């Protein structure tokens, strides 16, 4: 070893080394830079990243050796974590220089290491997982996670309706604000429809030079804005109670109607001939079947307990479900005629 060091210090050896370096064929191994940000060559960054990966693989294989004591295992595990951080620095520098992003869409070179990550992202490999205190650390972490999940579940288990906003409408202020906003938007949309129809009629009219001022549009030709086809707003609690009451009343009514019908015959099912083909037993002298007739003294019709219809579930009346009235052609023509009369009165009479 001493002889090799002496050779390296000789004048001829240093001359050959300088000559090889100038030609770009130096055989002396270069040391890896301490800072990845100091390298500005993408090719060099790729090279040093590969070098770090090879070193990580070598140390991960070495940490599996059962001949190592606990101190050596801890030192190797620390070195592996340092190399992993250094690999991340080189990957960030590669991305900064416009290279590939190795952190995205690339599987881990160490496999799935879930459950072996300590605090601060510190990882344990090989025999380091069996070190004293490491198993207890992972067991306590799992217990803490289970405890936090249970605590979160119990915290949100018995929340009052006010937490979800179900009691915001009880004071009536929110319903009043919503009703006012609905009326304003309803009026705006209605008059937009009216103005659109008026412009369509004016485009087909010969008098294209008629222009109405803002003051003339106030009357709107006697057209009134219809009310919103909906019942008066009520709090959510009252609406739910009304629906429950309507369902209960409909069910009781159906049940009473079913109980009031006469009792049917004791047989579970009437004969097929009596139910479907009564004309087979009634024939005239020529042998032709007599058409069935409805007798007043016939047995009462059978009624079954049918489920309530969809209308029984609704809290709206039939009038509430009617579409709002929309001005037709006659109403629009009346509006235009009144506006034209008003314009002529102001032009010739001044009133």
From Swiss-Prot:
GO biological process: generation of catalytic spliceosome for second transesterification step; mRNA 3'-splice site recognition
GO cellular component: catalytic step 2 spliceosome; cytoplasm; post-mRNA release spliceosomal complex; post-spliceosomal complex; Prp19 complex
Biased composition (Basic and acidic residues): 202-214
Location relative to the cell: Cytoplasm; Nucleus
Primary location: cytoplasm
Key words of the record: Cytoplasm, mRNA processing, mRNA splicing, Nucleus, Spliceosome
Name of one Pfam family that matches: Isy1
Disordered as annotated region, ranges: 202-241, 254-327
Gene3D superfamilies, per database record: Helix hairpin bin (1.10.287.660)
Family to which the UniProt record says this protein belongs: Belongs to the ISY1 family.
Function: Involved in pre-mRNA splicing.
Subunit structure: Associated with the spliceosome.
Protein name: Pre-mRNA-splicing factor ISY1
Species the sequence originates in: Mycosarcoma maydis (Corn smut fungus)
Name of the gene: ISY1
């Amino acid at each position: 070893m001493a002889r090799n060091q002496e050779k390296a210090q000789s004048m001829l050896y240093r001359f050959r080394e300088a000559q090889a370096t100038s030609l770009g064929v130096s055989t002396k191994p270069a040391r890896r830079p301490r800072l990845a940000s100091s390298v500005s060559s993408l090719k060099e960054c790729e090279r040093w990243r590969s070098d770090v990966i090879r070193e990580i693989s070598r140390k991960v294989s070495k940490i599996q050796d059962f001949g190592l004591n606990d101190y050596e295992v801890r030192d190797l595990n620390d070195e592996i974590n340092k190399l992993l951080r250094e690999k991340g620095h080189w990957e960030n520098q590669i991305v900064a220089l416009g290279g590939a992003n190795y952190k995205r869409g690339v599987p881990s070179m160490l496999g799935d290491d879930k459950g072996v990550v300590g605090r601060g992202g510190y990882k344990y490999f090989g025999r380091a997982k069996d070190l004293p205190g490491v198993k207890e650390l992972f067991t306590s972490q799992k217990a803490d996670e289970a405890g936090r999940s249970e605590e979160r579940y119990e915290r949100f288990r018995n929340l009052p309706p006010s937490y979800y906003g179900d009691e915001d409408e009880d004071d009536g202020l929110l319903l009043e604000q919503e009703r006012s906003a609905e009326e304003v938007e309803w009026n705006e949309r209605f008059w937009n429809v009216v103005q659109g129809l008026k412009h369509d009629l004016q485009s087909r009219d010969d008098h294209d030079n008629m222009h109405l001022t803002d003051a003339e549009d106030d009357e709107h030709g006697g057209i009134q804005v219809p009310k919103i086809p909906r019942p008066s707003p009520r709090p959510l609690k009252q609406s739910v109670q009304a629906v429950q009451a309507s369902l209960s009343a409909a069910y009781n009514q159906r049940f009473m109607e079913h109980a009031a019908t006469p009792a049917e015959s004791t047989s579970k099912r009437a004969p097929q001939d009596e139910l479907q083909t009564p004309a087979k037993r009634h024939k005239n002298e020529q042998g032709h079947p007599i058409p069935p007739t409805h007798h007043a003294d016939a047995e009462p019709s059978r009624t079954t307990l049918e489920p309530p219809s969809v209308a029984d579930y609704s809290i709206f009346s039939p009038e509430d479900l009617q579409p709002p009235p929309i001005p037709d052609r006659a109403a629009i023509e009346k509006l235009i005629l009144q506006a034209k009369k008003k314009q002529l009165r102001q032009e010739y009479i001044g009133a």
